[in-house]
């Protein structure tokens, strides 16, 4: 499928079937995120894959998961951020958006639904998953 067709077919999914994501498909989605461009190729992302039902329940304390069986907690490493000198803007949020977009498009190509969530409580996610202070939970990517 050509890119524009793929981009047009990608849509937000807020109701998942409960179908498990195959390891091979998950690996392809994660690889798409790994090769996504980032400012100065800093690759600030650290991704936590959540599949066990008891861990999905931990995510649900911060935001609903709509029946997703796989949640990617997309974090950025803040220990060495790339800061724009003119106004102090960190490139990490933009980078994470690009990385998530790559993974959502890869999921769509595999006929897997997705939704990127930014409106969640990162403090809850940090606590539930023991995420250190220099790693910032930035987005949730729900798959199914």
Language-model segment annotations:
Residues 67-72, 130-144:
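A glycine-rich helix N-cap at a beta->alpha junction
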Residues 15-16, 46, 113-116:
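Short catalytic-loop micro-motif centered on adjacent basic/acidic residues
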Residues 33, 72, 87-128:
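Small-aliphatic-rich amphipathic alpha-helix that forms the alpha element of a beta-alpha
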Residues 46, 120-122, 139:
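Residue-level "edge-of-site" marker
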Residues 1-25, 140-144:
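Specificity-determining recognition surfaces
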Residues 42-45, 112, 138:
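Short secondary-structure junction motifs
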Residues 60-63, 127-131:
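A generic local secondary-structure boundary/capping motif
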